């Protein structure tokens, strides 16, 4: 399977301030790839570098085989990008926004836009400034999807959507992916990663911390330990071999102990905080 996105040694600084440093990873064609990290980790800088919205200092980015700098116009024609903030010209009707978005790409998106508006329950006759955050998000989603791109790049797409529309969004993504599209999903909602992504990259302080399959992250040797030891309640992630845990507990009074697989939220915190016990 070929790579849809290849990022090698990406570095970007903002004066004396850190952006990203020596970031390298790839996104395979046809997968839903999770891109995780807290605010300020470098996710947005990476995405904006991919799209040519900012100029990076070092490294190379290739999308579908094209250089992100030299072939930017070719790349953008086949990308559906949704930023985290849904900003539009106030006063425009939804129908006008969708037509304008299609015209910029020089593509007739009428049929696909109509289908998406129906699925996401969007009234094209309303003005954008009349809509709630969630409904503006829907319009942004449609703008990213209506030209049926080969690559979707979503930055916090479901924030503001109600649970029903969140499900519809991922149904649509899965349908496009089943037809050959690729999706890069930047999100804080770890349950979305667990349910929909095959692989994930975790960013921390401008650096790539880990890239792996979700299954591997969840099947790591780390365990969640809950116990009452010497009258004290403990709840933590244990990284070492369990035989060593048993040795550590010798000489202690253990009233109760539960050893279980950690959730993806706990795995993320384990990697991000380097929590050790």
Each language-model region and where it sits:
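Conserved ABC nucleotide-binding domain
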Residues: 110-132
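Catalytic Walker B motif of ABC-type/P-loop ATPase nucleotide-binding domains
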Residues: 152-156, 161
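C-terminal coupling/interaction segments
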Residues: 238-277
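Hydrophobic anchor residue at the start of the ABC signature
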Residues: 141
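ABC transporter nucleotide-binding domain
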Residues: 168-244
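Conserved ABC transporter NBD signature motif
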Residues: 59-70, 74-75
């Amino acid at each position: 399977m070929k790579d849809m996105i290849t990022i090698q040694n990406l570095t970007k600084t903002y004066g004396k301030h850190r952006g990203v440093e020596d970031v390298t990873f790839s996104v395979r064609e046809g997968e839903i790839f999770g891109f995780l990290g807290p605010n300020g980790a470098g996710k947005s800088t990476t995405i904006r570098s991919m799209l040519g919205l900012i100029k990076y200092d070092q490294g190379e980015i290739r999308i579908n085989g094209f250089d992100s700098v030299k072939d930017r116009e070719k790349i953008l024609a086949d990308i559906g990008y949704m930023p985290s903030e849904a900003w539009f010209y106030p006063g425009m009707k939804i129908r006008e926004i969708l037509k304008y978005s299609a015209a910029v790409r020089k593509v007739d998106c009428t049929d696909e836009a109509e289908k998406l508006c129906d699925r996401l329950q969007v009234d094209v006759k309303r003005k954008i400034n009349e809509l709630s955050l969630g409904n503006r998000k829907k319009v942004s989603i449609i703008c990213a999807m209506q030209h049926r791109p080969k690559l979707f790049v979503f930055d916090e797409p479901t924030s503001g959507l109600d649970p029903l529309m969140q499900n519809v969004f991922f149904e649509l993504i899965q349908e496009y992916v089943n037809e050959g599209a690729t999706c890069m999903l930047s999100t804080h909602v770890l349950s979305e990663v667990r349910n929909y992504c095959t692989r994930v990259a975790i960013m921390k302080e401008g650096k790539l911390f880990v890239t792996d399959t979700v299954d591997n992250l969840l099947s790591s040797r780390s365990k969640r330990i809950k116990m009452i030891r010497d009258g004290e309640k403990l709840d933590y992630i244990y990284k070492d071999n369990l035989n060593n845990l048993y040795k550590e507990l010798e000489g202690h009074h253990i009233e109760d102990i539960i050893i279980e697989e950690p959730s993806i939220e706990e795995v993320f915190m384990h990697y991000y905080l380097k929590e050790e016990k």
